[in-house]
Amino acid sequence: MWRTEDGGTSWSAVRGSPGGDDYQRIWIHPTDPNLILAVSDQGAVVSSNRGESWSNWYTQPTAAVYHVTTDNAFPYRVCSGQQDSGSICVASRSDDGEITFHDWHPANIQEYGIAAPDPRDPEVVFGSARRGVSRYDRRTGQTAQVGPDSAARGEKFGRNVRTMPLIWSPVNPNVLYYTSNVVWKSVDRAHTWTRISPDLARQTWTVPASAGRYASSVTPAPRGAITALSPSPKSGAVLWAGTDDGNIQVTTDGGATWKNVTPAAIKPWTRIFNIEAGHFDARTAYAAANTLRIDDMHPHFWRTHDDGRTWTEINHGIADNAVANSIREDPRVPGLLYAATDAQVWVSLDDGANWQSLRLNMPAISVRDIQVKDDSTCVCADLVAGTHGRGFWILDGLTPIRQLARSRGRAGTYVVTPQTAVRVRFGTNEPTPWPPELPAAQNPAAGAIIDYALAANAAGSVKLEIVDASGRLIRSYSSDDPVLDPDPALDPASYDRVCQKNPGAADCGLPLYWPAPQQRLATHAGLHRFRWDTRYQPIGDNPRTGEVEATGAVPHRSERTPVTPWAAPGRYTVRLTVEGKSYTQPLTLRLDPRVKTPPAGLRQLAALSREMYDLAAASHAAYLQARARVDSLSGAARAQVESLAPAAPARAPRALARPGQPAPATPPTLESASRAALAAAMAMQDADVAPTAAQVAACTRARAQVNAVLARWRRLEPPPRRSRRR
């Protein structure tokens, strides 16, 4: 950015970078020249002092990416080059409760390049672009140039454009493909390359009329390059290739021979943005043909089931106002397709015969690429989108869409089979959370996601229960559950009134933007989503006991954490009850894959946690029984019971115990013993590690305390009345 103060006689640079910021617009306030707004490929910046200093564009989610890929880390990272801001790999989940700059790293790929994380080592990211192939090692920060010809250019290397495909074989993790106008193959992680195709671009170079005055009378030279490549997940011998001048070619013998299978309706200069080889049939493929360069703004998606001999255009239902960019097949459900255009994302449940919008909460933006992330390492089923101007987006949990596709639009009341849940902690950033001014992206929900459908509005309450493999009830929710406190996210005025009357109420003193809206089981017709936090049932009258914790707090998403242990990894049953009828589905809960604690230590942790929880629950239940009997007693009997179960203070504690919270002084009561046992349990919940000697000792003390007060209660508790014989 340049400035002149003498009518253009001389100029001075006031803002820019060695790599070029690509400024597109500038605005100066008409009456206050101190105020300047500049916009570039990265975002907008503002100066209030005539350009002496500027705000930064990292406050805006304006990343313009060309492609999107994921690695095999946990949590998985989403990678791409981005326009004039370098490359990026960003975690799909953060341990800090929200995704911030701490969770991303550059990968030294050219801005328009394609990332190809090593499937066997997620710390290594290969990248493609016009200058070849790069290999970035996150551990060292070093980048090596490892393309087919990293020094020379010309016919030996071939022609290329900005976004050159670079992709690993889905059937052989040692095979890497790269393209120019020919296809290259490496079997040793880019140390050596072999050319496995001829020139796959068009051999006639007619310039379309849309070139207008830019057309030349000189006979055009060959210019096409490969812009789409898809190795088959069913056969290592099958590859599909598409070019930026409108060719689709396929090989079924590993590149020995290629066949041009371009649909007759695809015109020269059509850019094949991507091809998706079928996940269930090696003869199937889908293609996204982008016709922007020939002044055709309509979407064009294609499908073949016979090696490209015949093609069907599959656009019905897609808005006719944006070109095609990407198409993907769900790897779990045949015929379930996802498509991206220059405006939004679409979904088809019937192999492309019909499409419907899947935009949801995404902005209207050019979606350049989409990927279905579903494998054993991520323990997920997500749709990842890369946009040209709004960064990355992830649709978490494709299971409801998959069930609809399998049943072709299932009706009625049912529970969707949940995907495997991973027991992770939502946030571990202690003790001070990131301020709300820090740009951040949302974490996916922590816990088990449970989707259910109601055919009609429920006549009564709806109940959702989690049952373990032994049949024991672990957690229960009801649409009639009381609300803990007025919800500041939904009723701030009422929340303020409660806090004014009782400053000791839960979360009072916090700004209203911290707590998350409380979950409520929906009772109206439709498809609904609920989350089990993978903890045991809270102990006490209110099943939603809990407060916003400082650790892991996130603006607008801070959960009221139940003061109960984590449920152990294993098999569970989800049971939905509506109008007296129950619907069930199995649920598997897994440990965080990053945990390396030996099984014996994990078993000890689970056993002690459950034992302390059971002791706390038993002691609290006895306390409630004792309090129920107090009014019917008098004299010494009443005094003895009250010594075990004294009345709670006017303002009872919000929770029975917290990690590290000391038990009240002796003599112990039923409630203090319950608090001691729960405190011992909660002290072990911060990490999936074997209990320490101190924690085991605390459990031993709590066990003895609970057993002692329960024994005293049993001696005082009158036997149940027996009915008289008549």
PLM feature segments, named:
Residues S134-R135, I450-D451, A458-S476, R571-R575:
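Beta-strand-rich binding/interaction modules
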Residues P511, R544, D592, R603-A645:
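Preference for long, solvent-exposed alpha-helical segments and helix-linker "stalks"
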Residues T428-K463, V467, A525-R531, S609, ...:
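Contiguous beta-strand segments within globular domains
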Residues P538-N542, T577-Q585:
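Short acidic/polar inter-strand loop motif in beta-rich domains
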Residues L587, H620-R726:
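Mature extracytoplasmic or organellar-lumen-exposed domains after removal of signal/transit peptides
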Residues L473-P565:
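Glycine-centered tight-turn motifs at strand-turn-strand junctions
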Residues T399-F426, T584-A618:
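Low-complexity, Pro/Ser/Thr- and charge-rich linker/hinge segments at domain boundaries
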